[in-house]
Each structure stands twice: as structure tokens, then as C-alpha cells.
Swiss-Prot record:
Reactions the enzyme catalyzes: dUTP + H2O = dUMP + diphosphate + H(+)
Cofactor(s) recorded in Swiss-Prot or TrEMBL: Mg(2+)
Function: This enzyme is involved in nucleotide metabolism: it produces dUMP, the immediate precursor of thymidine nucleotides and it decreases the intracellular concentration of dUTP so that uracil cannot be incorporated into DNA.
InterPro entries, per the entry: dUTPase, dUTPase-like, dUTPase-like_sf, dUTPase_trimeric
Functional pathway: Pyrimidine metabolism; dUMP biosynthesis; dUMP from dCTP (dUTP route): step 2/2
Residues the record lists as binding substrate: 64-66, 77, 81-83, 91
Gene designation: dut
EC number: 3.6.1.23
Keyword annotations: Hydrolase, Magnesium, Metal-binding, Nucleotide metabolism
GO BP annotations, alphabetical order: dUMP biosynthetic process; dUTP catabolic process
Taxonomic source organism: Leptospira interrogans serogroup Icterohaemorrhagiae serovar Lai (strain 56601)
Top-rank taxon: Bacteria
Name by which UniProt lists this protein: Deoxyuridine 5'-triphosphate nucleotidohydrolase
Family according to the record: Belongs to the dUTPase family.
Amino acid sequence: MKIFVQKLRPNAELPLLQTKQAAGYDIHACLDSKLVLEPGNVGLVPTGLSFAIPQEFHFEIRPRSGFSTKNRILIPNSPGTIDSDYRGELMIPLLNLGDSSFIIEHGMRIAQLLIRKTWYADWELVSEFADRTERGANGFGSTGH
């Protein structure tokens, strides 16, 4: 699939698969200088990239597992959704859950990008559902787990 990408900064790096069968493309920080993320704070990290996502798709932005577990750095709105009609710079929000400052440097792999199919619903309003299920309207904790 071809997806058009604009480099908004000359030092921006394209998304990269680390293995042939990886689902997520690594996204890199695009910085002119180091960014210090203090404990408990969220910072928006620029990628220097803008995308023209085909209409029937969207991107999901997720944490990289090693980056998150080793550094206690998370994406607070994970998974983040990038809609096909957005043309601005891809910015990655990072939350520092650690006890000390974390330094983000240019080129650091900070997130994963997944390409997802977008489904559009044709909502039909009904007064009741035609089928009944064993669970019914039982919600939180109703299955005992």
C-alpha cells in the first residue's frame, strides 16, 4: 500500500519495520535538541512527518513494549487514533511514570504506528434487539473475573 508522507523537517525519519513480519512501524522523535520529560509530566514529541492516509484506513499509535517497560514511559491516550483526514504533523504524547527525568533525543524510537482498516457503520435505531443473550445487560464484573 502506498501512503504519501511529507517530511516537515529535513532530519525526520520515516516509519520503519524492525522485522519482516512486524505489525508496527517504529516512529522516531524529530528534535533539534534534547527534550527533558519530568516525572509525572506529559510531553508532545514531534516526528517531523505528516501523512496522507487513504480514506478507508487510519493509524493507531501505541507504545513500544521495550521502551515502555524499561523506561516507564507511556502514551497516555493509547492507542492514539490518527484519522485519514488529518494532515498535520504526527505528534506523540509521552507520559513519564518514572521517578526521575527522562531525556528524549533525536532519532529515539518512541512509539509504534499500526495501519488499520476503518469501518463505517450504518446505525439503525430499534426499540429492542431481536436476539437475547445469556449475559444480557450484566456489565462490569458480571462474569466473575
